């Protein structure tokens, strides 16, 4: 899941940020770039941001760096809830994702966050149009077979690398108003080998025979999707939240 900031609709309107977009949050001590959730469950004049992400798991979501270094004189607890912030929209016209068997390093201007996937590392991405994605991908996969799809005018780039019959890395980048089903690609990434038909259809982003979409991620720690949870409930394999935790590790 994306690192996010929750904001009241009235404050979102005043700041010029929209639900599903990105916002830059700045204080005298640091800044973050986060996905925006506009909701009336948040109090006007207040923001909510989880503290789960670090520099190892996201490019710009370390909330602790924003907080004023004031502590309670007795308990030593930080004054996390009283730091003034400035909020402004941050535009990323391209979104995408990457999967790799190894940890990836992205161009400095790319916004990224790491997500748990089976068999390697998953990343959700956002960027400006000037990032040279094709050059970046080819530089990191020079020793493997590479398949590519490029639509320069449409701002679409998709690529996959293979070591024999094993998918080793893939990248999907497209305009922010389009959404490829990365659940399908994650499922294919989890298997040991891909057949010729799966390899041919991989860059289409469409459903592949024998590979089911897990749906939107509900449990980020173990990469458990909504479809997986619903299937377990419908089949009777799980009848309670305790069953889901035991079988799927979903919290």
Task: Mark where each language-model region is.
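General structural feature for long, well-ordered alpha-helical segments within catalytic domains
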Residues: 8, 32, 225-228, 240
């Amino acid at each position: 899941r994306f690192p996010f900031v929750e904001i009241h609709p009235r404050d979102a309107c005043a700041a010029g940020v929209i639900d599903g977009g990105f916002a830059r949050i700045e204080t005298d001590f640091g800044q973050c770039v986060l996905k925006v959730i506009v909701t009336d469950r948040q109090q006007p004049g207040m923001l909510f941001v989880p503290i789960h992400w670090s520099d190892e798991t996201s490019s710009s979501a370390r909330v602790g760096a924003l907080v004023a270094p004031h502590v309670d004189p007795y308990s030593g607890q930080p004054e996390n809830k009283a730091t003034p912030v400035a909020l402004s929209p941050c535009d990323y016209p391209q979104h995408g994702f990457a999967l790799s068997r190894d940890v990836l390093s992205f161009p400095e201007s790319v916004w990224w966050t790491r997500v748990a996937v089976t068999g390697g590392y998953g990343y959700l991405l956002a960027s400006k149009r000037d990032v040279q994605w094709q050059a970046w991908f080819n530089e990191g996969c020079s020793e493997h077979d590479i398949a590519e799809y490029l639509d320069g005018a449409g701002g679409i780039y998709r690529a996959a690398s293979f070591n024999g019959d094993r998918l080793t890395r893939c990248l999907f980048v497209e305009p922010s108003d389009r959404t490829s089903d990365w659940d399908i690609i994650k499922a294919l990434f989890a298997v040991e080998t891909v057949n010729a038909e799966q390899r041919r259809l991989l860059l289409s982003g469409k459903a592949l025979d024998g590979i089911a979409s897990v749906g939107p991620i509900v449990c980020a720690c173990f990469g458990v999707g909504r479809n997986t949870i619903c299937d377990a409930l419908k089949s009777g394999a799980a009848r309670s939240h305790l069953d889901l935790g035991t079988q799927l590790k979903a919290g």
